């Protein structure tokens, strides 16, 4: 099993080197009747990836986590992205020969979201990770800046979105230890005090409060909120 690159179809030195590696493995498979798995990965991102190397996402995460400038030439450029955990799940499933969709032809439409499969078998040799995210550079940077501002805004992202969850998990690995704690804005009067913990456009807000003895606060309910 090897992870190749979607650049293998390009007519440049990098693409040619990837294609030659694939061809060598295919030749071995044909000569020895051995099962091989070739994954052509698009842009790979994930936790603890080395910044300022070959992953734009890791560089963005590192820079924004450290309040460094991020420069992008065209925010509208769209990337195809795979998350490292999904790649690992696909590799394990191939080894165990389970959770794999086998296509009859490369143009076949597959209801990936309802199958639960981690991999698609394109042909005898080639496989794809089913979960591929498509996001623009501008969208990625905006999301990361929102994460950085969370300590002030207390607004958390929509973690029901798979990409947001993967990107946030990735971003956290670039924070310094001191960045994991932060002060809350404590509001206090003669009744007691309260402080907001988190807010979300999906579920409202959560806060902690303390009421002094003999004081009644709230004392009402909501039919709908």
Regions found by a protein language model. Name each.
Residues 2-6, 39-41:
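SDR active-site strand-loop-helix element
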Residues 11-42, 55-66:
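Active-site Tyr-X1-5-Lys
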Residues 49-59, 77-96, 102, 136-142:
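Substrate-positioning beta->alpha
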Residues 179-223:
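A short glycine-rich, His/Asp/Glu-containing loop-to-beta-strand
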Residues 37, 80, 133, 187:
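Residues that recognize and position ribonucleotide moieties
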Residues 96-186:
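Mid/C-terminal beta-alpha module of Rossmann-like enzyme folds, strongest
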Residues 42, 62-82, 102, 112, ...:
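A conserved pocket-lining segment of Rossmann-fold NAD(P)-dependent short-chain dehydrogenase/reductase
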Residues 6-13, 44-48:
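Conserved catalytic-site region of short-chain dehydrogenase/reductase
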């Amino acid at each position: 099993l090897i992870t190749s690159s979607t650049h293998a179809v390009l007519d440049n030195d990098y693409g040619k080197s990837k294609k030659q590696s694939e061809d060598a493995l295919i030749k071995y498979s044909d000569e020895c009747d051995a099962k091989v798995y070739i994954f052509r990965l698009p842009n790979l991102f994930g936790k603890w990836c080395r910044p300022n190397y070959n992953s734009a996402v890791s560089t963005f995460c590192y820079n924004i986590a450290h309040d460094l400038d991020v420069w992008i030439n065209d925010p509208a450029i769209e990337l195809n992205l795979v998350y490292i955990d999904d790649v690992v799940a696909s590799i394990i499933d191939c080894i165990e020969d389970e959770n794999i969709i086998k296509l009859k032809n490369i143009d076949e439409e597959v209801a990936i979201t309802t199958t639960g499969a981690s991999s698609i078998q394109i042909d005898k040799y080639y496989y794809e990770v089913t979960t591929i995210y498509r996001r623009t550079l501008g969208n990625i940077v905006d999301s990361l800046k929102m994460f950085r501002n969370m300590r002030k805004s207390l607004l958390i992202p929509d973690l029901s979105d798979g990409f947001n969850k993967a990107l946030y998990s990735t971003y956290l690995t670039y924070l310094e230890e001191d960045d994991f704690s932060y002060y809350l804005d404590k509001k206090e009067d003669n009744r007691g005090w309260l402080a907001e913990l988190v807010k979300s456009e999906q579920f409202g807000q959560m806060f902690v409060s303390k009421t002094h003895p003999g004081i009644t606060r709230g004392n009402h309910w909501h039919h709908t909120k």
